[in-house]
């Protein structure tokens, strides 16, 4: 007679083993959809209004004051109405508007917008004061420029940036105000602010013009022209041969666009100094290659101010 008493436990063991295998397997057996990436989402219907960027807002701000006269109350009223519905003061928009006005050389509007911003207690930075100083100089408002310079110099005596000294020296150099130029240069030396090549060349030209050869020689001996300088080429700091700058760069508070007289003098001097022979140029290239320095192919910085 056939006995089946061991068949049932055997089946139970089989089912238990299979069930444990099913539940103990790793989750890598989960079926992955063929279309990878984030699932598609429907557009959000509650964002129906397009957002206006800061550049377009700056353009609107310029448009609202462009057709107005230079009356202070009229311009200030238009600017107040423009920011009436803003929860916070739109400092970024005003800064971008000032950059656009500076590109368009609207010096009167720059002065008005900057003074309006400062009256609100906003944007009190050295960059704002420098743009105001530059606009006052371009608009031939020398008294206000000197007043602003004296105020900043007295408040930030040792912390005055070098570009402010450079700007004031360039202003006095253009207008042949030699005594005030010497005063600013003396303040630089007293505070230990090292002048750049452009400042040294401008002060040296004034010494030569006034026939002060002894002071010119002392100046050139104290501040000799540098042989090397550092530049950033494609994000890397590279040591290159220094180019003798005869005018200030815009980043250092250089000469303004209206200073054509200085530009013409410097260009004529550069043309006279470009009479080097080919042998001397070859020797310079060989010397530069033997020292293993990287030369720059950037254009000369002497013509940045005229742009």
Curated annotation (Swiss-Prot):
- The disulfides recorded in the entry are none
> Disordered: where is this region?
248-307
From which residue to which does any coiled coil extend?
A: 238-292
Q: Which PROSITE patterns has this protein been placed in?
A: PPR
The protein's UniProt keywords, in alphabetical order, are:
Coiled coil, Repeat
Q: Which branch of life, at top level?
A: Eukaryota
Spans of the PPR repeats are 125-159, 161-195
Q: Which InterPro entries match?
A: EMB1417-like, Pentatricopeptide_rpt, TPR-like_helical_dom_sf
State a single Pfam family of this protein.
PPR
Q: Where is the composition biased (Acidic residues)?
A: 260-284
Q: Which family does it belong to?
A: Belongs to the PPR family. P subfamily.
Q: PANTHER family, per this entry? A: OS01G0757700 PROTEIN
Name assigned to this protein: Pentatricopeptide repeat-containing protein At4g21190
Record organism: Arabidopsis thaliana
